Amino acid sequence: MTGNQQMERQHQVAIVGGGPVGLALAVELGQRDIDCVLVERHRAPVRIPKGQNLTGRTLEHFYFWRCVDEIRASRVLPPGYPIGGVTAYGNLMSPYFYWAHTGGRGPRDQDYFFQRNERLPQYATESVLRARLRDLPSVTTHFGWTAERVEQDDDGTRISIVPSDESAFYSWSADAQQVSPQASDARADRRVLRAEFLVGCDGGRSLVRESMGIERSGRDFDQRMVLAVLRSRELHEALKRYPESTTYRVLKPELQGYWQFFGRIDVGEGFFFHAPVPKDTRPDNFDFLGLLHEAAGFAFAAELDHVGFWDLRVMTASRYRQGRVFIAGDACHQHPPYGGFGLNTGLEDAANLGWKLAATIQGWGGQDLLDSYAQERQPIFRETGEVMIAGGIGRDRAFLERYNPEKDGQEFEQAWAEFGRRARSARQAYEPHYEGSPVVAGPPNGVCSIHGEPSLAAQAGHHLAPRLLSNDRNVFQMLGQGFTLLAFGAEEAAVRRIDEAARSLRVPLVVVRDSFDAERAAYAARLVLVRPDQYVVWAGDGAPADPMTLLRTVTGQELRYGAGRGLPNG
């Protein structure tokens, strides 16, 4: 169709934005046979190497999305290459530095997560997810289309889409020293898509969020940042002074707590670089090579492949839902790429919202289940942004104002060692949980928070730790697409009561039986109820006093116990 002709088709879920979060949500829904449509303005993934660090928890999602092997095969770094970072004072040639490993060591990774972490460019992650979508017949994709307008009414949601005009996207040519517009397409065709629900995964400048009148709050640091993509063999060789690392950040007083940092794209010559720059900086009026040399501490030959800019903000949406419309990923939370939280947080949004949308559409999720998405996810990012990111900038700034190696070298060395130790331990204390969720039978006065301690014990509101069964398979290999009841040495009558309650409510439930010994004893409960995103919603040694109320609570059909109120055992 051409001109002003329009085509309407009804879907169950429409997704605006097909970056990694939107793609992941489409996979999550498609695997549950939900009819969804995805609209993405780019025809192909944009080859800018951001969002590279994928945690062990995120790799669990890819396992359940049935493409974890493809993710690992898409890595650019050699298998087993250490995922960790160097922090240096002044520049990368400084004698003052510390190193922090962020992959595959200790209970957080080997014991607490079923998968080890991975590192690859975001465009490679997107390519894997796009390929996975091709195997899911219930998902329709519109790549190269842009959402122009979003509306909702009592009957559903409505999106007007047009072919993308990619002349709005620019590339930086280091040779020509200018920006060049890409080829554009005429907006000759308009279409209208309808859906029961709509999810905006369309980034920090979200059309969906703005159309719904959802405001954001947080902190705007009023700081322009540059993202440069470069190739330099000389830089690679110079960085051999450090243990093998994936990131190299520089702290110094004049940066006021902001970072200059390099990240590896590959092992050999590919890097990206972030740093604060003056507000009026453009690709054609700034010495970017000079900035790279300043951060590195020496001059080196380099080829610039891309230069872009972003504004340093830590922002959270006031709400994640407006009627039938939801937002996820950067559309509801935005922050600088400090700490590797961004993409992982967005993918957790997708996993959380996806099963709840499917449950609601399929009829076994109650009217309150969808509200629990924001009730769980919003406080997690608010604390992440305020404590880990904005708070981290403040802590770095305070340290740099207080200590200086030129004034008191011994005092600085002692403080720097302690500074590094605290930086390493802070991330180890990051354990997002939903103890205060209204759809979790959590402890009295529980709250949803990032502050916790990874534990092998099964705790309501916390991520399930993977354990081996007596047949040498992992518990995670037995988890169902719906709820799963782990019954380890439990009385059969108790198992039967919970199973019968689930059947009567049409809640999909898989029962995994085994003995209560060996690794399974670490759960400290003979009965563990696990929801579709691998979080524990209830644990005990005997059946709850009212299994029907338990199942209604954790599926949003009844909030009798409310947030943070436990269900006693019978």
Where are these regions (language model features)?
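Conserved mid-domain beta->alpha element of the FAD-binding
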Residues: 17-27, 31-33, 62, 129, ...
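C-terminal helical "tail/cap" subdomain of flavin- and related membrane-associated enzymes
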Residues: 318, 358-463, 470-479, 483, ...
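A conserved short coil-to-beta-strand element within the FAD-binding core of flavoproteins
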Residues: 143-158, 163-167
